[in-house]
Amino acid sequence: MSSQLESEASFEATTLGFLRRQFTRPKPLPAGITLDGQVAIVTGSNVGLGLSVCKQLLQLGLSHLVMGVRSQAKGDVAADQLRKSFPSALISVWIVDMESYDSVCAFASHCESLDRIDIVILNAGLIKTPYTVAHATGNEVTLQVNYLSTALLTILLLPILKAKKAGGGSRPPVISIVGSDLMYQNEVELKGPVLPQFQQEETFSQFSWYGRSKLLQTLFVSKLAEFVDLNDVLVNVSNPGMTGGTDFFRGYPALVMKLIAVGQWILARPVNVAATTYLDAVLVQGEKSHGSFTSDWTIKPYPKLWYTPEGQELKERLWEETMEELNFVGASRIVNDLKS
């Protein structure tokens, strides 16, 4: 449905568009939603938005929660807190380090052991300063975590979800990749290779690169959806908006943190409110969200670049580069096999 919203794309890139999104009134979930018997996977789930959406899924009766975390110790602490509130639920803590392809592959392989998977929320992400390289891959970490490893995990999980889809008239499983409306304000060079642009340390800007990495996510998902039957698995991008009360900006200089805190005090959503956008993406929007960008409890347009011939060329070029980068797992074969 995002593909049909070109007329709204320019406005979303403006300051007024941002303000309208931030002050949109939250929409409650429809009555009667229950997740009894269902299994959900949430990455980046030991703090902030990830932990909040875990709690909300459990409040809806989720039977089995898999928390994908980088630190076993921190994950166990968060899981123990949840177990005290939801003693009847099974809560597992599995390691996934998004800076490592090997860790991502191991996590996906672990997911094959589950009897079913109904919901996947890929929430793990970062905004990093200074310029840092992921030692396991040699890629800049913003690109690695927010885009490449997230794309890899999505591709690896899709056939697993398709194979484990519940029978009968149940809704298809959903993968929602957490994006950002910062993509509306950031672009990449339209000519030449896309991924190498993130290896140019001299052009590094943490906020810009974060927004650009989220732009790549949305371009990728819009293309990926062409290979995935919406009756098998739904895949979308969900934007929580500016959110206060998280550790997202940890490690920044004190002055920067103070400025961010002021901005968040004025504009940001509470964590528990922002997390409901994830629930909306996986439980409410349904098939119209397939391949789309969800934000503020509705479907929003892609960035205006997407609707141009240049944007479509960029999408195709990014896709080819991504398939080449992930060729070590046979990404192209996996994606093409989804059609069968």
Where are these regions (language model features)?
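NAD(P)H-dependent oxidoreductase Rossmann-fold/reductase module
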Residues: M1-L114, D118, I127, N186-S340
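Redox-cofactor binding/interface segments in oxidoreductases and associated redox assembly factors
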Residues: V42, L122, I177
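Glycine-rich, N-terminal phosphate-binding loop of Rossmann-like dinucleotide-binding domains
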Residues: G44, A124, N146
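Hydrophobic positions on the long internal alpha-helix
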Residues: V104, I121, S149, L153-L157, ...
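Conserved catalytic-site loops of classical short-chain dehydrogenases/reductases
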Residues: D118-I119, R171-G179, N236
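Short alpha-helical oligomerization interface
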Residues: I127-V145
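Glycine-rich NAD(P)-binding loop of the Rossmann-fold in SDR/ketoreductase-type enzymes
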Residues: V141-S149, R212-S213, R269
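Amphipathic alpha-helical dimer-interface segment in Rossmann-like NAD(P)H-dependent oxidoreductases
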Residues: V145-G169, M183-N186, A225-E226
